[in-house]
Structures are given as structure tokens and as C-alpha cells.
Amino acid sequence: FIMNYYSLNKYLKNTFGEKVYKISLNGNMTCPNRDGTLGTRGCIFCSRGGSGEFASDALLPVHGQIDQAKLRIKKKSDCKKFIAYFQPFTNTYAPIEYLEKIFTDAISEPDIVALSIATRPDCLGNNVLGLLEKLNKIKPVWVELGLQTIHEKSANYIRRMYPLSVYDSATENLHKIGINVITHIILGLPSESKEMMLESVKYAGSKTDGIKLQLLHVLKNTDLCDDYESGKFDVLSMEDYIDILCDCVEVLPENVVIHRLTGDGDKKLLVAPMWSADKKRVLNSINREFAKRDITQGRKAK
């Protein structure tokens, strides 16, 4: 069965000629939404691990984390190329000398073919942009931005703590220096209709090189979990999620790389929706529905 969308796997094979694995690294960062600069409680859905439950051990230096991750991957695959992905918290929120050291350490490994940095659009000052531009001349650099929604009411609810205009200028600045932008969008935020979610996806699709579509997960020990357990909102059913996903893929321009169609929360922390824990079943159901509806990326893109 042919997937009629531009998946990350397709992009990686086109770009690097073979399968490439992403290694999640821990840069030992914090976030302005946690250290008191903008807030202390983080985004409403964010776990204590800073949404990096699968990242390596922060106590190890970068080279050690990469070696550890490679050993794990090589048990199940003969993959020879890797992407260094700095995942938890805000990975440009540290002194520039420190950032230069950890990012340079990561890309100095010969089998690391690209660097991916998850951060906030309000943490991309000129000094950071200068560093990223320099690194991008050595190996490709991607920047991942957690936009999540374009709707102000939802952005306030999730405590994103920056306006849409900040995302816009960050994507512009990154594109000016030749850096690929990957935008995260959450599907299933409380009080958002399907139309609202599609508006966010369309908007991101017009600004970004890649997109991660993420089901809203409720994780233990988050403020979102308190709201969920007190009955303030419901999570999406698998059928509703897949229905929304079908439309999301069709409204995305065909050149936008789809990095993720669901996302899997840490099973130990997951409170809802429990169906999302069975990743294999979810992906099979998505593929079946895509085939049934003959879903084609870009068909409804304007």
C-alpha cells in the first residue's frame, strides 16, 4: 500500500540515501516557562521531564549519550546514520558558549548527519541564530517549535506564553539563514473544534518545512491531568482523531514533511487516552483509513 503523504522516512531516504534514526539527547536545560522568567509551572501538558521522557541520561556528556543510544538502536537495526535531537525543555535557553559546545560535540561525530533542536520561538535571539547559521554550514540544522495552536484562547489555556507573531518572526529569521523549521501542533485541545485544529495545521503548513501532529496526551502530575480528572474536558476517541488526521494531511502542502502522525506518551505516565498506548494498532488504523479514503497530501491545500 502506497502512502500518499510526505513522511519523515521518505524525506530521510531522499536526503541521506538510507534509513536514519533520531537519537534523543538531554542538554540539561530548563525553560523560561519554568524558571520564573515567564512562569514556574510550564506548559499545562508538559511533564516534569520537559516532554523528553525518551531522552538520554542528562548526567552523561553528549558523546556518552550518543554512544548509549546507538547501542540500544543497534540491537534492533543495522542503521548507520543518526540525527542528534536535543529534546527536553528549551534547548537554546542557556549561555551561548554552552550551546556551542554541546551542539558541536554532537555534530562532530561522523555518523551524526543532522542536528535537530527543540526550542521556543522566544528563545532565538541574534546570538543563537548566529550560532545555528554557523553549525548549519557544517551539517544540516533543524529547529523544532512547539506552536501547538494558532488560537489565542487555547494558547492561554496551555500557558504557551508567547503570541503568534513571535512564532512568525522566528520562522522568518530561521528561513533567512537556511534552517529547516519543524512545527508541533496538538490535536484535541479542550474547546477546539475540528475546524479550529485544521486552521492551525493550515497556518503552520504555510510557514514550516516539517510538521509534527500530536494527539493531546494527558500525563500524570500535570495541571492538564487535574483538569481532565475533574471532568473539565474529554480526550479524542481514536476514530475522531483519525478522522481529523485525514483532513489535516489533505490541507498540508505536499512539500511539507510529516514528521509524526500521532506521538506516543510515556506509558508509565499516560492517563488518557489509553488507546494511544498501542502505537502499532493506532498506526495500522491510520493507514487503513488513509487507504480507504484515498487520502493524498496537498489535495485540499490552497
Annotate each predicted stretch with a short phrase.
Residues 49-69, 76-96, 111-124, 140-166, ...:
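Core AdoMet radical
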Residues 1-83:
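N-terminal [4Fe-4S]-dependent radical SAM core
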Residues 100-104, 133, 193-209, 239, ...:
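Short, electropositive alpha-helical surface patch
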Residues 165-223, 239-262:
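Conserved C-terminal portion of the radical SAM core fold
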Residues 69-73, 124-138, 169, 198-207, ...:
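Short amphipathic alpha-helices and their capping/turn segments at secondary-structure boundaries
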Residues 2-10, 19-21, 217-302:
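Auxiliary Fe-S-binding modules of radical SAM enzymes
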Residues 21-25, 82-84, 115-117, 141-145, ...:
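Hydrophobic faces of well-ordered beta-strands that scaffold small-molecule active sites
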